[in-house]
């Protein structure tokens, strides 16, 4: 086994998805800037969007059925470079990393000595295949209190779930709300919730 490389005051920040409007890179570096203000160095690893396959279907399914997906050769080399290293923490957003499994059938993230923090930016059901992975040192962030409770209830192997308040600009005055000429809601992303209802109902009975 290779000698452990220690980066105890360094945080490793992955981006395995670009998210809506290519915001993954932005989130990673803004969070990294705040961490570095605390005197902690950050290391970034941006994996190309399609280098790690997604689960492949809309309906959530057991993680074991998704773990063996093949990874792009170049991305595989990037990921292998972190095996055996130690970090203060590993971060990613709607991460694909928990599904990755090594040749010895252990989880890839367990080969790096660091707690893994997965920022879940959607309803957790969308990420069942990664949240269900039984990592040794798994934590999650969510943007909604009920989402946190959902993760705690259905994924008890995740050690802790933290709610992160949404950032916002200064409060916009609503005094002239009635003067609005148009009432249009622009949805950045949309998935038909009926697709997931069957899965939600099945989880209720677990």
Model features per residue range: what roles?
Residues 12-16, 24-153, 171-173:
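Extended catalytic core of nucleotide-activated donor transferases of GT-like folds
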Residues 204-206:
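Conserved small/polar residues in nucleotide/adenosyl-binding loops
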Residues 139-148, 157-172, 181-192:
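Donor nucleotide-sugar binding/catalytic pocket of nucleotide-sugar-dependent glycosyltransferases
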Residues 5, 177-178:
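Short, flexible hinge/linker loops that cap or flank conserved catalytic cores
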Residues 9-22, 183-194:
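Short hydrophobic beta-strand segments
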Residues 110, 178-179:
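Extracellular/periplasmic catalytic domains that process cell-envelope and extracellular macromolecules
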Residues 1-8:
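Short, Lys/Arg-enriched N-terminal segments with co-localized hydrophobic residues
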């Amino acid at each position: 086994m290779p000698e452990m490389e220690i980066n105890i005051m360094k945080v490793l920040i992955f981006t395995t998805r670009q998210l809506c409007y290519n915001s993954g890179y932005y989130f990673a570096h803004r969070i990294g800037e705040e961490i570095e203000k605390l005197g902690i160095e950050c290391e970034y690893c941006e994996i190309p969007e399609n280098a790690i396959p997604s689960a492949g279907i809309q309906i959530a399914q057991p993680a074991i059925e998704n773990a063996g997906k093949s990874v792009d050769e170049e991305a595989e080399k990037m990921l292998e470079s972190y095996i055996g290293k130690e970090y203060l923490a590993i971060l990613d957003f709607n991460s694909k990393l928990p599904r990755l499994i090594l040749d010895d059938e252990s989880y890839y993230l367990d080969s790096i000595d660091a707690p893994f923090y997965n920022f879940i930016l959607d309803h957790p059901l969308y990420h069942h295949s990664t949240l269900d992975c039984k990592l040794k040192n798994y934590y999650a962030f969510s943007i909604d209190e009920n989402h946190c409770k959902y993760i705690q209830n259905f994924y008890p192997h995740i050690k802790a779930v933290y709610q992160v308040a949404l950032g916002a600009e200064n409060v916009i005055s609503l005094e002239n709300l009635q003067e609005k000429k148009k009432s249009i809601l622009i949805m950045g992303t949309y998935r038909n919730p009926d697709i997931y209802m069957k899965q939600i109902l099945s989880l209720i009975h677990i």
